[in-house]
Amino acid sequence: MANKYAYNKETNEAKTARAMAKSLKISPKHCVEICNAIRGMEVTKAKNYLEDVIDMKKSVPFKRHNRQVGHRKGQEGWAAGRYPVKAAEQVLKVLENAEANAEYKGMDTENLFIEHISSHRGVVLPGVIPRAFGRMTPFNTPTTHIQIVLQEAN
């Protein structure tokens, strides 16, 4: 069965490259905020941005899931932000995979931008933690799916 993308726009397949990752053990909320931050960026700028987030030099603005999130110094346009390192590493891997797919198709990798990026909640991996007096508390692990479509700029 073919992978379905949330991106339905008719495109020239010779000028687009795609990549997808499923069931990653990262926070869906962090991933949504990272995707919103890098959507529409050039690939080189997005990679530099994600590397800065991993090194905790730049923060990701949390615009939707920002309750109890502190302000960050040096953030432009939005005060609340965090450094979601684990999610940024996974998004960077998928972005590099999409760039490699573009290179394989013979596209100019210096001229790529992120046409579409989205993240969705995946399956929840059930788990339990033993508690006192023989009880158990659910401790579930959320997973995330990521989709990226790169396009060559004209």
From Swiss-Prot:
GO cellular component: cytosolic large ribosomal subunit
GO biological process, one term: cytoplasmic translation
Keywords: Ribonucleoprotein, Ribosomal protein, RNA-binding, rRNA-binding
Domain of life: Archaea
Annotated S-S bridges: none
Pfam families assigned to the protein according to its UniProt record, in alphabetical order: Ribosomal_L22
Database matches in InterPro entries: Ribosomal_uL22, Ribosomal_uL22_euk/arc, Ribosomal_uL22_sf
GO molecular function terms attached to this record: rRNA binding; structural constituent of ribosome
Subunit structure: Part of the 50S ribosomal subunit.
Cited NCBIfam families: PRK04223.1, uL22_arch_euk
Protein's job: This protein binds specifically to 23S rRNA. It makes multiple contacts with different domains of the 23S rRNA in the assembled 50S subunit and ribosome. The globular domain of the protein is located near the polypeptide exit tunnel on the outside of the subunit, while an extended beta-hairpin is found that lines the wall of the exit tunnel in the center of the 70S ribosome.
Family: Belongs to the universal ribosomal protein uL22 family.
Name of the protein described by the UniProt record: Large ribosomal subunit protein uL22
Annotated source species: Methanobrevibacter smithii (strain ATCC 35061 / DSM 861 / OCM 144 / PS)
